[in-house]
């Protein structure tokens, strides 16, 4: 609790240990997935780098820890206590207490990239997802009332993906699906190949959590024209707009009215503009193109979607005015770079102390809406 508000962090991250492959991946696959070198600095699958960062990384740097942001001295100083114990579950809960976070929904770090490539063997992808999901369930078991996981599913094979989704949610208790907005195997998020997954997710009640991550080996907005700095600025909000178009304007949410979708780690300022633009095109019949949905895209967003904001996001009031607090959640991004300079006092405190927002709006963003989004019994 922070300043009298209960808090659910809708987008928090784990840092996977280097040995989870050895402990959780079946023996016949272990030689194909490698995390080697000083501090996890060389990572590959079937000899191919897991991410663009793995292609560029200077493996002579002992401080790298296998993640680009971890090379920052400021990051290492900010999270020194958790780093000393390799971000074990107890350290995450202790840091939640420092921030005033009551409940967290956990996303991957290495898993942002590990099975996201077009040429990945579907059987290996399924094994990696099962290994990660099992490890994450064990991680959350440290405090199952406060820690909740978001699963990986092998999207290279939609049938296997449905099977893993049901296992991860019904057997392991995970509350969402991590899903990048980028094209995978030539498919966008409105591809009919994914419809069985959406049907299963809607039936089970788990949320599709659209979450970008820079430095993927997949094609992403900005990767063909910007350096790492510009690419990170561009890819999150631009890819989320395209994902939102897929779901709201391309008929997916109309076809699956019980499906829930969250757009995370891209801020919320893009949403009012994008809904207005999609609605305008819909009202004018797509500038000569046939309408793809019966209702305006914003109708489906407000029926089935949520976005997230950082605690001090200046455009949150604009979102609330034009879209509504009912569609917004709080996300700290702990322990990634978005919360450096804010942890621990401001990652949540900048919102709980924001008197420009009503008490009701803050309560919705901090607790009521993320609880509904993830169907948390809290």
PLM regions and their residue ranges:
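Short glycine/proline- and charge-enriched loop/turn segments
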Residues: 119-121, 223-233, 344-350
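Short aromatic-enriched loop/helix-cap "lid" or pocket-rim segments at secondary-structure transitions
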Residues: 19-22, 117-118, 220-223, 273-277, ...
């Amino acid at each position: 609790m922070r300043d009298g508000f209960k808090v659910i962090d809708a987008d928090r991250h784990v840092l996977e240990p280097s040995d989870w492959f050895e402990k959780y991946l079946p023996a016949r696959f272990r030689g194909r997935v490698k995390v080697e070198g000083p501090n996890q600095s060389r990572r590959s699958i079937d000899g191919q780098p897991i991410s663009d960062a793995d292609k560029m990384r200077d493996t002579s740097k002992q401080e790298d820890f296998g993640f680009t942001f971890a090379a920052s001295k400021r990051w290492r100083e900010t999270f020194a206590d958790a780093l000393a114990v390799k971000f074990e579950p107890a350290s995450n809960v202790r840091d939640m207490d420092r921030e005033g976070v009551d409940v967290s929904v956990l996303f991957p770090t290495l898993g942002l990239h590990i099975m996201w490539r077009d040429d990945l063997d579907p059987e290996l992808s399924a094994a990696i997802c099962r290994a990660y999901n099992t490890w994450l369930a064990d991680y959350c078991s440290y405090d199952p009332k406060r820690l909740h996981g978001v699963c990986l599913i092998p999207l290279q094979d939609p049938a296997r993906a449905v099977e893993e989704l049901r296992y991860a949610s019904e057997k392991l208790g995970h509350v969402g699906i991590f899903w990048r907005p980028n094209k995978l195997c030539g498919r966008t998020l409105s591809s009919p190949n994914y419809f069985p997954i959406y049907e299963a997710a809607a039936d089970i009640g788990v949320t599709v959590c659209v979450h970008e991550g820079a430095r993927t080996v997949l094609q992403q907005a900005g990767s063909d024209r910007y350096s790492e700095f510009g690419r990170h600025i561009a890819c999150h909000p631009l890819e989320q707009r395209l994902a939102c178009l897929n779901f709201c304007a391309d008929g997916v949410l109309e076809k699956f009215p019980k499906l829930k979708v969250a757009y995370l780690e891209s801020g919320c300022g893009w949403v009012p503009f994008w809904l207005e633009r999609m609605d305008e095109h819909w009202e004018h019949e797509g500038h000569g193109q046939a309408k793809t949905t019966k209702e305006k895209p914003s109708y489906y967003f407000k029926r089935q979607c949520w976005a997230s904001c950082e605690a001090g996001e200046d455009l949150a009031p604009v979102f609330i005015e034009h879209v509504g607090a009912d569609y917004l959640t709080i996300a700290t991004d702990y322990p990634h770079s978005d919360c450096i300079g804010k942890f621990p006092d401001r990652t949540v405190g900048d919102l709980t102390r924001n008197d420009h927002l009503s008490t009701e709006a803050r309560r919705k963003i901090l607790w009521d809406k993320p609880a509904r989004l993830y169907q948390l019994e809290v």
